[in-house]
Amino acid sequence: MSSREVTKTQNMNNLRALAMQKIMGSFLVPKSEVIMKEESTVDLLLDVDQNPAPLKGILLSFQHVFAMFGATILVPLILGMPVSVALFASGVGTLIYMTCTGFKVPVYLGSSFAFITAMALAMKEMGGKVDAAQTGVILTGLIYVLVAAGVKVAGTRWIDKLLPAVVIGPMIIVIGLGLAGSAVKNAGFVEGGDWKNALVAVVTFLIAAFINTKGKGFFKIIPFLFAIIGGYVFAVCLGLVNFDPVLKANWFEIPGFYLPFNTGGAFKQYNLYFGPETIAILPIAIVTISEHIGDHTVLSQICGRQFLKQPGLHRTLLGDGIATSVSAFLGGPANTTYGENTGVIGMTRIASVSVIRNAALIALSLSFLGKFTALISTIPNSVLGGMSILLYGVIASNGLKVLIKERVDFSLMRNLIIASAMLVLGLGGATLKLGPVTLAGTALSAMTGIILNLILPHESN
């Protein structure tokens, strides 16, 4: 979950009621269908189906690339994945999404922070292998597809019943704090740690913090990118960066895909794995689907279009789900809709789908530049640690904001029990073995919250 995911989680809950009223449509939208519009919160210069002049369009597309870049590369760097694959998957995923939605929604898909904790734990439990992590994200994408079919057939009331704020809030907190120890270790705040690494982490943290609090305009949209660049330059000055990988890399290289079959050595291989480590990743879909609804509601208000009606929530979920499965199949992280790019649309007042499409093509091109991706791989762990301290903390804090914004009443014992059980089980290292399936961490926390919410009787104030 990136800063974009953090912000959109806040928007998701207080706008959910509006979103639920906007959900209709079909998987196949006839070309003759009347475009459904509402009052826009922004006076757009270019609407969704309009195109800018060629040169202006290229510049606008690069602006979207800059907006998504910091968060998109940070996820694979934290997880130890090839950055080139994440860039490739974000570009392909965006094009898949646009195809599924009939090129009607100006959304960019990038790496999702929500899955970092679960994927990292799956890798750790598998001895560093990515089998469970990649399989879990592939299946998560398929869950999106199933939910899309469910929305098409049965509407959305069942989603709202499963995902009240008292479940969503604690789950976000568990996701945010699940890897707090890893962030502290990477930052160098451990016994015997190098003071240089700790100093780099502090500088990186402060750059991101100041930009988030004082930045204006476009600077406010890309705090991750500026923080990574600033921390990296500082690390270079302290002699913590090794440029040998950049010197050895080719200018043009095929992205370092991981594939679930033997390619004769052309690419690395992982095996599809359906064990408990894989199952533990699936409940993350609960949070990301809710965020998906919130993101599209906000974008609908900016563009003055009811995207949850046309092309419909089922089609946007379908595109997001297929894109996520394809990314994981290729060895990349999960994809998600990016609020940073929605912010760019609000700032530039240009909602042209063609601009987003060209940004996706630029990301695809960057994934083949070997020197470029090698340079990114030289970013020290201390830079990532400084970013992660802020990132994980903000994610957890926004779980609290969800509870506050939705006015979850903790004077009611029912709500107190649900949140307490989720937090203790999610952060306390609890595991539950049910035959061949073992639930732990985020998965156990999510299932506990959902079950308690369904079975505990409601109280009156």
What do the PLM-derived regions correspond to, one by one?
Residues 81-86, 103-115, 159-168, 220-225, ...:
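Short, non-helical or kinked segments that cap or interrupt transmembrane helices
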Residues 30-107, 114-126:
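N-terminal signal-anchor module of multipass membrane proteins
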Residues 2-59, 245-266, 301-302, 308, ...:
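Intrinsically disordered, low-complexity non-transmembrane regions of multi-pass membrane transporters
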Residues 55-71, 196-204, 222-223, 238, ...:
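Hydrophobic, membrane-embedded alpha-helices of multi-pass small-molecule transporters
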Residues 126-242, 358-461:
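Membrane-embedded alpha-helical modules
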Residues 36, 42, 207-210, 225-281, ...:
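Hydrophobic transmembrane alpha-helices of multi-pass solute/ion transporters
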Residues 41, 69-70, 204-214, 222, ...:
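Juxtamembrane interface elements at the cytosolic ends of transmembrane helices
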Residues 32, 42-55, 77-98, 280-353:
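Membrane-embedded helical hairpins/re-entrant loop segments and their flanking transmembrane helices
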